[in-house]
Amino acid sequence: MTENAPTELAITGMTCDGCAAHVRKALEGVPGVREAQVSYPDATARVVLEGEVPMQRLIKAVVASGYGVHPRSDGASSTNDGQELHIAVIGSGGAAMACALKAVERGARVTLIERSTIGGTCVNIGCVPSKIMIRAAHIAHLRRESPFDGGIQAVAPTIQRTALLVQQQARVDELRHAKYEGILDGNPAITVLRGEARFKDSRSVVVHLNDGGERVVMFDRCLVATGASPAVPPIPGLKDTPYWTSTEGLVSESIPERLAVIGSSVVALELAQAFARLGSHVTILARGTLFLREDPAIGEAITAAFRAEGIEVLEHTQASQVAYADGEFVLATGHGELRADKLLVATGRAPNTRRLNLEAAGVAINAQGAIVIDQGMRTNSPNIYAAGDCTDQPQFVYVAAAAGTRAAINMMGGSAALDLTAMPAVVFTDPQVATVGYSGAEAHRDGIETDSRTLTLDNVPRALANFNTRGFIKLVAEVGSGRLIGVQVVAPEAGELIQTAALAIRNRMTVQELADQLFPYLTMVEGLKLAAQTFTRDVKQLSCCAG
């Protein structure tokens, strides 16, 4: 290395500017280092040297300070000493596919390893089939009951669950082939191995092939994108019963007369309402209240909506024992004994990391078994990245896909970070729940002084025209700047308007700037404008579409 030659390193494991300061101090303590500039947001270190300093000495100093490190290449399409990079991708869901396609686009060769069905959770046993089932249940509900029953006769529908299931799974198969299998089959730069991967060391995995035998796959970079599976709580007797997780519930060939649901996760609530609308008597056992971590008004609104539909919500209730005999589940609770024909357990999802032998590669996980990554999807082990539900990031397929794309860019020598400050989230109950940014309580915990306004839907013309005014829109603004920092919505179409709020937050708009925008009349998203106007005026005193 010549005098004053800058050397760039990629640093993993930093979580704040204080970490960057520790890395800088470690590097500047190496003899021959004149100056080190370390950036936490970029996860990089730029080192100015005086004379010859071995790269290994710099790496050793960073590792000794508790962080991961590897030399950084700045090429847009990465090469490895002039050779094509080989990237191993473990998994085939949203994160895995996004990474594989972006890596190939930038010149890499990819080996994708999948132990089960191509496509991962979302298309096969998650988002897609659940939303189809929820939509079918919504149609059944409207035929049974709607705001227009005075002029349109309501007729109790006949539910043919087998036919609905055939329709649902046909669309699942269609999307899996179109968006996953077909794309992989048509890409010569991607080799698919069917089998289970386990790390041999930090540069190779052993694949136990589904059709027998094993293969060692060497890699320059590796992405772990193995997703998550339903978590099962350690309730005495539960594992000895034929309980459902969401996987079994979504492909059930019949609708149970009585369904008990353990958990109040997003999956629990979505499927509880769907089964209720398809004919089940549903009882939810919630350890706390619904939407415990969100604004309290959200949980109150959904609890009221569920109870109005005949769904029994038992708050602060846990099963202490589960038994199954003669085709019936018996749950012991603090409220007495609960009997059901089927039991759905939906208490959350656990990362699929236990069988990967991550310790052989030196990859760190947290107490929940999730792989710890930085904003660039780097693990603490050089050359190994992770994305999606197996990491400590939010478990949404769009987050996983974005993470996979950025991981590929970083693997290939680029610099891309995943910014989740304006990440929208939607729960597909009815009414839907959609959030983005800060709640008032979260802002308070971060020391941000806020001003909030809540607009009930009886002030939104579209809701009035629909004769469905259940719900609200709440805006959270920063005091002083007036900048919008959070939005919470409970509304039948909450998911269709939350991205507008996310863009407003991303672009650092004030509530006044939002109030001044043009919104089409008689749309639900117009409610955002009306909510913004409540910061300075009484919207009840405005004409229908006052600007």
From Swiss-Prot:
Cofactor: how bound: Binds 1 FAD per subunit.
GO BP, one annotated term: detoxification of mercury ion
Keyword Flavoprotein: yes
Annotated ranges, domain HMA: 5-70
Keywords for the protein's UniProt record, in alphabetical order: Disulfide bond, FAD, Flavoprotein, Mercuric resistance, Mercury, Metal-binding, NADP, Oxidoreductase, Redox-active center
Superkingdom in the source lineage: Bacteria
Disulfide bonds: 122-127
Cross-referenced PROSITE patterns: HMA_1, HMA_2, PYRIDINE_REDOX_1
Catalyzed reaction equations: Hg + NADP(+) + H(+) = Hg(2+) + NADPH
EC number(s) from the headed UniProt entry: 1.16.1.1
Cofactor section: FAD
Residues reported to bind Hg(2+): 544-545
Binding site for a metal cation: 16, 19
Function: Resistance to Hg(2+) in bacteria appears to be governed by a specialized system which includes mercuric reductase. MerA protein is responsible for volatilizing mercury as Hg(0).
Complex and partners: Homodimer.
Leftover remarks: The active site is a redox-active disulfide bond.
Protein known as: Mercuric reductase
Source organism of this protein record: Acidithiobacillus ferrooxidans (Thiobacillus ferrooxidans)
